[in-house]
Amino acid sequence: MSSISLKEIIPPQPSTQRNFTTHLSYDPTTNAIAYPCGKSAFVRCLDDGDSKVPPVVQFTGHGSSVVTTVKFSPIKGSQYLCSGDESGKVIVWGWTFDKESNSVEVNVKSEFQVLAGPISDISWDFEGRRLCVVGEGRDNFGVFISWDSGNSLGEVSGHSQRINACHLKQSRPMRSMTVGDDGSVVFYQGPPFKFSASDRTHHKQGSFVRDVEFSPDSGEFVITVGSDRKISCFDGKSGEFLKYIEDDQEPVQGGIFALSWLDSQKFATVGADATIRVWDVTTSKCVQKWTLDKQQLGNQQVGVVATGNGRIISLSLDGTLNFYELGHDEVLKTISGHNKGITALTVNPLISGSYDGRIMEWSSSSMHQDHSNLIVSLDNSKAQEYSSISWDDTLKVNGITKHEFGSQPKVASANNDGFTAVLTNDDDLLILQSFTGDIIKSVRLNSPGSAVSLSQNYVAVGLEEGNTIQVFKLSDLEVSFDLKTPLRAKPSYISISPSETYIAAGDVMGKILLYDLQSREVKTSRWAFHTSKINAISWKPAEKGANEEEIEEDLVATGSLDTNIFIYSVKRPMKIIKALNAHKDGVNNLLWETPSTLVSSGADACIKRWNVVLE
């Protein structure tokens, strides 16, 4: 039986927001980190190669809400996590991995609406039974609850503004501490957890206190950090202020966003001065530091987590994960990628572009901030170079501007011969040389266009008025004809088959018409299984038969805003191969990498490879 199965996920980077902390979580059992990105929570395994845990787990159970924080349960081997979102809901969930089928099953254990605003941090107790959840709200800024029933286990009080972070001491006697935008540090004893003490004097008045964490094992110390550049050390059992951690030889030059303990003596801090520092709590000395280029705003460090054996992962504002180890002066490795929806994709080699203007070359793992706005199209038909068109009105080659458009390019399509067709907001159809930016031909359309496809000899344009498809000859744009049957709704994507025998045209309602280009008649109108806007149509590459003749074109892969991927057949229009819920919030791009492999990207900032088995 024919099927599509998930082969690989290239996960996005953690979501970041300027002037806010992104809390990372680490699980030593699976050697994985957890973080939020968009409306999904991700678990990313740090092991290379064969492993008993999946490389990536994606949890999409928060619906339409943006996920703000994800934390592992501290119980060894439990595989439970708790995630919170901007609506104030927390969900406890777990996963199971079937290595034979390479499939991950996610199970929701419990979910609770706990706050009236975004959740900023979650902390588990060391028994894996209690949760402290904090953030913004109307009546309260946090709760203590049991993970399974949601019953209240105390009261979060003493704050007048948003709480930024919380931590439960990972040993008895149980203690907790919360820190917030009002500059206050509040200490609790429990369970049930009650207000014990509040400190508003050891962080500068009016500053934001951004993170807090008890030392591991006995919890002898608890550290708080904030925008006032101060590192305050408190007693873990009584909550009394002990001292500031400061080193005259190593002044902190920017607000501190996050901290993480490496062991019971050393902890790491990261901040807006693009520096990662490791401190000794007893001597108050900075024992090691790593500094990135401070001139780059994207190098501000907004998150950190210790991963054991003196290793640290820090998070840059641009989403890059940086790996460090005590005793090594240089970064061990970095992981870059997208953390916004991917809007353009090309394969062989794999290059992707997202709506924040970022372009990622996956073969060399290099990230480029070439544009300041959404990437419309990419062309990699020339070796060692790529051409990109963006809503910032430019065509660039490897980041160098080659053409500036008079009006914004709406949609674009590249063929493999180094040419790109562009529709602009001024209703111009432009044919450009992809790698020089020269306009080869242009024509003014009679009505606004919403989709375009370029092949070797033709340019097909979907027109908004009348929902018709107009086909131009590439050799002479003055010569054109309309396909006889219009679409049922506004055209959203067009694809001319490689042999130029067919044109597949999709609309915003999810229906696809297949036209025969020679007769200009509809070949089939039965490709109607999508329920929302068609975002991608890709023809399966032609294969050679036994006698070296090319096998007739048959299969077409389609991706839609309805999150699904379908493969339709020209010969058998009612035959369909499905991959449902392929991308949270919709499939944006879909291409055949090989005759048996599809590559897709979506609004969830993921890139996925799919195995296609045909029978």
Curated annotation (Swiss-Prot):
**What does this gene product do?**
Involved in the depolymerization of actin filaments. Enhances the filament disassembly activity of cofilin and restricts cofilin localization to cortical actin patches.
Q: Could you provide one GO biological process annotation from this protein's UniProt record?
A: negative regulation of cytokinesis
Q: Which domain of life is it from?
A: Eukaryota
Q: Where are the WD repeats?
A: 2-45, 46-94, 95-146, 147-189, 190-235, 236-280, 281-325, 326-363, 364-399, 400-433, 434-473, 474-516, 517-569, 570-611
One further remark on this entry is:
Present with 11100 molecules/cell in log phase SD medium.
- GO MF term set: actin binding; actin filament binding
Name of this chain's protein = Actin-interacting protein 1
Q: Which residues carry this modification: N-acetylserine?
A: 2
Which residues belong to the signal peptide in this entry? none
The record's annotation in Gene3D superfamilies points to: YVTN repeat-like/Quinoprotein amine dehydrogenase
Gene that produces this protein: AIP1
Originating species: Saccharomyces cerevisiae (strain ATCC 204508 / S288c)
What's the family? Belongs to the WD repeat AIP1 family.
Q: Which Pfam families match?
A: WD40
A GO cellular component annotation in the UniProt record: cortical actin cytoskeleton
Q: What is its main location?
A: cytoplasm
Q: Which residues form a coiled coil?
A: none
Name its cellular compartments. Answer: Cytoplasm, Cytoskeleton; Cytoplasm, Cytoskeleton, Actin patch
Keyword line:
Acetylation, Actin-binding, Cytoplasm, Cytoskeleton, Repeat, WD repeat
Complex and partners:
Interacts with actin and cofilin in a ternary complex.
Which cysteines form disulfides? Answer: none
